[in-house]
Amino acid sequence: MLNPVWLKSLVAIVQTGSFQSAARALGLAQPTVSQHLQKLEEQVGVTLVQRSRSGCQPTTRALAFMPHATALLDMHARALEALHGNRERVGASSNIGTYLLQPFVRNYLTTANERGEVDLRIAANPDVADQLLAGQLDAAIMEWWLPHPDFEYRLWRVEPLVLIVSPDHALAEAGCIERDRLVDLPMLGGEPGSGT
């Protein structure tokens, strides 16, 4: 098992470009960061950083490993959060997250009995659905939902779909318009995957 403390040191070295800067960023002594890297290199059996008088450079293997190291650190942080935290990961499609959800989040944060936090992620509807399916969200509020056997869904609210036309357009005074009258009209709508 890779030690997350050692991984943090490697990531800091690669990101800052030096042992001294990495130590400063981590709030550690420079020899401690060097020791972390040495132990990690011994464990994995490859050199991760080339040291020279002019500084240090990550090896090709270190660069290939970096996405995995950062993913492991992220997973480690999420695991600790799951054990000790009270953070809800909520995804919302763009319009909902921007215009409708904010007062509900604020109300939750001010009335939660425990110290609660909300990690609100606003994205396009398809991206929110993908994050929910990947287990990256605890809940999602979306403009549309295709039923999925692993999830329970509930209708939160219904918003009217409004047609906006110029005052001289034939439909300007039409009131409620049947869907069939709209089929052949050129229209601008929301981004692909949105509910509009």
Swiss-Prot record:
Xref: InterPro entries: LysR_subst-bd, Tscrpt_reg_HTH_LysR, WH-like_DNA-bd_sf, WH_DNA-bd_sf
Domain HTH lysR-type: 1-59
Positions of the DNA-binding region: 19-38
Domain of life: Bacteria
Keyword terms of this UniProt record: DNA-binding, Transcription, Transcription regulation
Coiled-coil spans in chain: none
Pfam families tied to this protein: HTH_1 (PF00126), LysR_substrate (PF03466)
Record-level Gene Ontology MF annotations: DNA-binding transcription factor activity; transcription cis-regulatory region binding
Family: Belongs to the LysR transcriptional regulatory family.
Protein name: Putative HTH-type transcriptional regulator protein PtxE
Organism: Stutzerimonas stutzeri (Pseudomonas stutzeri)
